Amino acid sequence: MNRLVLFSLTATLLLSAKPASQAQTTGPWNNKSCAVVLTYDDAIDVDLDNVVPALDSVKLRGTFYLIGSSPVVARRLPEWRRAAQRGHELGNHALMHPCDGSLPGRGFVTPDNDLSKYTVTRAVSEVRANNTLLNAIDGKTARTFAYPCGDRQIGGVYFYEQLRNDFVAARGVTGGLQTAAQVDLTNINSYMINGQTGAQLIDLVKKAQQSGTVLVFLFHGVGGGHSLNVDLKAHRQLLRYLKAHEQDIWVAPMVDVAAKIRATQQR
């Protein structure tokens, strides 16, 4: 009788135990070990010329943060629509991309687009106007926001507080890897990329895999088009690594990953 009980208990434990590999992949990242989000800012030509074809070639989806007033949005609107139809997120990067000109090193900020001269009402209205434009392009209502220049305050007021219900989340510019529980959905961390090699980009992904965290890349130029740039080879190497390890890495637009984080935090 004792042997029978012992056998039954052992069998139960064996059936309920999870392999180590499975234990590492359970969690908030779509049952994978980590999440990687590829974001591209400012609505520049190389997004459509270089990035979208590269992502589509390996069947990965990214997030493109569009400045509504950018001539590239108006001139190539059908291409942006097609990108959205293929699963890429068109995120909101404000209508005019206002940055705080009162901060050090902000000589590039024009008086018309100086966030420090804005009222909160104006900032919120312009972001909502850009949402209307984006909805006209892609027909979607759920999307994320990215702070122009990472600036979050106007006169000490966090203007996004009035926009919480308009977006799933907002992406910031502070580098760092975080678990789902650690993420601040009003200011998601991201790594700004400028000149890194493919090996360095892949290294960041490996750290996310090891720590079970979310990694958000913030790109501007890819193969040119912006002073903040990564070369095509490095970007291609990153995409190839992500594709080769897609069983372990969840690569998705910011809106999808943020929605998953929100659901995890609300449990």
Task: Locate the predicted segments by residue.
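Non-membrane alpha-helical structural segments and their capping/turn regions in soluble enzymes
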Residues: K117-V124, G198, N229-L232, R236
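Active-site-adjacent substrate/metal-binding segments within catalytic domains
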Residues: V37-I44
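Bacterial Sec-dependent signal peptides at the C-terminal "C-region" and cleavage site
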Residues: L14-W29
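Extracellular glycoside hydrolase catalytic/binding regions
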Residues: S190-G195
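Metal-dependent polysaccharide deacetylase catalytic core of the NodB/CE4 family, i.e.
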Residues: C34-A35, D56-G155, N165-D166, T174-I188, ...
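Bacterial N-terminal signal peptides
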Residues: V5-S16
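Generic structural signal for well-ordered alpha-helices
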Residues: L48, V52, L77-R81, V124-L134, ...
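C-terminal domain-boundary segment and adjacent tail
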Residues: T25-P28, G62, P71-V72, N135, ...
